[in-house]
């Protein structure tokens, strides 16, 4: 009996440790967040644009997984479903764990801003994930909504299913 209980406790501990390793430690939503100092595409320190002024739709992108949700984001851009006078969108590129040199990633981001007037800033040390309680964001495209009151109300990591895309549109409609 003792061996069975010890085995069960060891298994529970291993499962818990494995969940923490995989980054399953995201804070529950909604929760308050702070504006952070990141870098613009010229490596100058900048705060997150529009924070406290408007609701913000944030694309927190791992350059290694930039194709996650590609069709969805193109569709969103073309149909303007996430656009409105009360919301602004911006991209934050994670730099810490990418296989690509930062200069190349910055160059690609600058070209994108020239093409569609996007706002893109850089997170060189995964500060956003740490400070905002997002858990592990490595190898994920993360879609977030931050209210103008500084509250993170929506956060999804990875490839969104059709159901999650529909859920996103329901949420973003409240903040447009």
Feature roles, as predicted:
Residues 33-34, 115-119, 134-144:
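Structural micro-motif
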Residues 36-55:
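A short beta-strand-turn-helix
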Residues 49-72:
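Short active-site neighborhood of thiol/selenol oxidoreductases, capturing the structured segment around
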Residues 139-176:
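Thiol-/selenol-based redox modules, centered on thioredoxin-like
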